[in-house]
């Protein structure tokens, strides 16, 4: 037993020494540039938090006046999308960098509305669905705090703000979002120094800082039967989990 423990200890020591062994650095001066550009591609999962109002009084325009309806709205899954863009990065010092990354986020959110007041033949709430397409033009401003480089990798964390313009939205949708939004970004990543470029995989979490619901949308609806679904929500906040690859 003692021989096995000694062998395992020696093996662990050898592996640790090998992991900490200095190697030839690829692109050793790449982080000394005052400013540089790059491109980015990635994928993301997006969700929409919806605050339901509960019972509501609506006029369906059928001559029966105001009637009470209860409709719940939910995005019951995380929907995938993709991201493309460019970046410019300013070196502040050996630890901090400031990055500006104009990009476009494309995706679709699957929303489900359940009318609890009007039941179907099976006694279940009737449902309506909406595929809320999203196309955002963004320009993220991130502060990067990086650890010292070791061999050909360098971990880091980020914190930033990402203002976005929403280019999507239809007049006949149940839910419509505002044309602008602002996201808080928190994430982590690691620089990998390859022979010809630096690869930076990054995972970040994004949360909307404002209510992104277009509350004036209900005034433009032509079909009054849609009102109960549109008015079932009084607040929405978007959130994303993004995996991005930067090539610099």
Model-derived segments and spans:
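Flexible, solvent-exposed loop segments that connect beta-strands
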Residues: 51-75, 108-134, 167-177, 213-233
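Gram-negative (and chloroplast) outer-membrane scaffold detector with strong preference
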Residues: 22, 26-35, 43-47, 87-169, ...
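Short conserved catalytic/interaction loops centered on acidic-Pro-aromatic/His motifs
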Residues: 153-154, 168-171, 175, 198-200
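Residues that define the transmembrane beta-barrel architecture of outer-membrane proteins
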Residues: 33-37, 78-82, 133-139, 153, ...
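Predominantly the C-terminal beta-signal and adjacent terminal strand-loop region
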Residues: 195-248
């Amino acid at each position: 037993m003692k021989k096995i423990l000694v062998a395992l200890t020696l093996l662990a020591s050898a592996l640790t020494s090998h992991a900490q062994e200095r190697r030839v650095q690829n692109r050793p001066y790449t982080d000394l540039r005052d400013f540089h550009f790059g491109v980015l591609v990635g994928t993301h999962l997006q969700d929409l938090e919806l605050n339901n109002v509960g019972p509501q009084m609506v006029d369906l325009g059928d001559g029966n006046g105001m009637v009470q309806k209860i409709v719940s709205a939910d995005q019951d899954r995380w929907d995938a999308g993709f991201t493309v863009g460019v970046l410019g990065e300013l070196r502040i010092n050996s630890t901090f960098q400031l990055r500006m990354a104009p990009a476009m986020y494309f995706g679709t959110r699957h929303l489900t509305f359940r009318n609890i007041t009007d039941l179907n033949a099976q006694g279940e709430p009737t449902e309506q669905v909406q595929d809320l397409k999203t196309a955002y033009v963004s320009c993220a401003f991130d502060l990067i705090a990086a650890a010292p480089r070791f061999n050909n990798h360098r971990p880091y964390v980020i914190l930033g703000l990402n203002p976005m313009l929403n280019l999507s939205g239809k007049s006949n949708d149940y839910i419509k979002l505002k044309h602008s939004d602002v996201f808080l970004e928190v994430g982590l990543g690691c620089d990998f120094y390859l022979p010809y470029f630096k690869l930076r995989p990054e995972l970040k979490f994004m949360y909307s800082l404002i209510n992104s619901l277009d509350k004036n949308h209900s005034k433009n609806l032509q079909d009054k039967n849609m009102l109960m679904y549109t008015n079932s929500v009084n607040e929405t906040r978007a959130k994303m989990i993004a995996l991005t690859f930067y090539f610099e």
